[in-house]
């Protein structure tokens, strides 16, 4: 329960800041490409820091790494709120990205604390905390932005600091000492970490699916405020409440539905069905003429994401030894970060040069590819039938 609260409060801060980041960036430069590059910088620091934090959590435990990430988030949001120059804004983004390992470390914590049979449900609860944070965070950010653009970031900084103090007092350790393993520092760089997990033949295809799915998702998240403003004239408050709606959908899916569906259908069917929903609804986002219609479309997209991501993570985790869970989650974070380096920049270029719908049409195509790759790994001999049912 404490871990749920930790992730929830952390994601409130994240949810406050992320929908407003394009508007912070707009104080210093304009254009979708610049916003995309800023998102890519954040992801590049995640890419560098994720495997390092994962390795540290395998060596020293999950607790100290979680606390480090919370403290880093507090300082980064403080810098963002106080930024008066482009250099300080960039520094805030760099620090936020480098210490953004809370979710990956929490997933490793869940892997330590659950059986293989219960892992998808445990990861779904972490996803629900993520979603609840995205309900409260954007709504708070939208309201606070009416006061000033600095207020949301300063409030997020205070939340992260409070979370750090609370965690320091009450968070227990989950990673048992006999499972801890010293890893040479040179092996904690993201390139070698990616190379090692890609050598794990039993999860290689699924890791490719993780990359493709998150390329699509990263482009959507970073580009959506620009898309909604260009097509529907939405401003900060409208975007903030829309992100809150997405959070509600994530909570319903990952907090309730996946726990009911997983015993009945299993991770494989949930993953295939979720990917099919995501690909279809990304295309519908690109084609929708109305902001009102966007709500049910993105609601179904969030349902698909909420089914696919915990199921995919659980399948990969179940194929990995207990002593390597931290490095696995760090490696997954590196893949996510690589997607977030490329996704926002590519979405910005597509938006500026190919048109408003382009990032979402490309995202739908990438998700179809993820569905094909997943089917080839999980459904040998049944791929065609499974794809037909999805």
Where are these regions (language model features)?
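Residue-level signature of mid-helix packing/kink "hotspots" within the transmembrane helices
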Residues: 15, 43-51, 101, 134-135, ...
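Short amphipathic helix-loop junctions that connect adjacent transmembrane helices
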Residues: 19-32, 222-238
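Conserved MFS/SLC helix-loop-helix module at the cytosolic interface between two early adjacent transmembrane helices
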Residues: 47-86
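Cytoplasmic helix-loop-helix junction between adjacent transmembrane helices
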Residues: 92-131
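Helix-loop-helix hairpin linking two adjacent transmembrane segments in secondary transporters
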Residues: 126-169
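Juxtamembrane intracellular "pre-TM" segments in multi-pass secondary transporters
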Residues: 172-208
């Amino acid at each position: 329960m404490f871990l749920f609260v930790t992730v929830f409060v952390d994601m409130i801060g994240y949810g406050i800041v992320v929908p407003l980041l394009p508007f912070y960036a707009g104080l210093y430069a304009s254009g979708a490409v610049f916003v995309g590059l800023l998102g890519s910088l954040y992801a590049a620091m995640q890419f560098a820091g994720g495997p390092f934090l994962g390795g540290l959590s395998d060596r020293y435990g999950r607790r100290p790494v979680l606390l480090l990430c919370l403290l880093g988030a507090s300082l980064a949001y403080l810098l963002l709120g106080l930024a008066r120059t482009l250099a300080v804004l960039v520094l805030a983004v760099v620090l936020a990205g480098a210490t953004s390992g809370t979710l990956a470390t929490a997933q490793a914590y869940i892997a330590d604390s659950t059986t293989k049979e219960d892992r998808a449900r445990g990861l779904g609860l972490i996803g629900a905390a993520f979603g609840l944070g995205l309900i409260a965070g954007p709504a708070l950010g939208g309201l606070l932005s009416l006061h000033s653009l600095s207020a949301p970031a300063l409030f997020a900084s205070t939340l992260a600091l409070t979370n750090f103090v609370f965690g320091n007092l009450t968070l227990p350790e989950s990673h048992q000492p006999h499972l801890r393993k010293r890893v040479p520092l040179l092996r904690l760089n993201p390139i070698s970490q990616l190379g090692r997990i890609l050598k794990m033949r039993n999860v290689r295809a699924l890791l490719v699916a993780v990359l493709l799915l998150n390329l699509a998702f990263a482009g959507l998240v970073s580009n959506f405020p620009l898309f909604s403003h260009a097509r529907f004239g939405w401003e900060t408050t409208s975007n903030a409440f829309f992100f809150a709606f997405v959070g509600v959908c994530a909570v319903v899916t990952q907090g309730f539905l996946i726990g009911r569906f997983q015993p009945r259908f299993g991770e494989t069917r949930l993953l295939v069905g979720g990917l099919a929903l995501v690909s279809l609804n990304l295309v519908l986002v690109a084609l929708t003429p109305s902001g009102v219609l966007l709500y049910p479309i993105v609601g179904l997209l969030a349902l698909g994401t909420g089914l696919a991501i915990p199921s995919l993570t659980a399948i990969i985790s179940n194929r990995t030894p207990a002593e390597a869970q931290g490095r696995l989650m760090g490696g997954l974070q590196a893949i996510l970060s690589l997607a977030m380096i490329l996704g926002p920049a590519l979405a910005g270029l597509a938006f500026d040069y190919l048109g408003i719908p382009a990032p979402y049409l490309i995202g739908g195509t990438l998700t179809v590819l993820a569905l094909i790759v997943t089917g080839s790994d999980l459904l040998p001999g049944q791929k065609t039938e499974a794809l037909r049912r999805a």
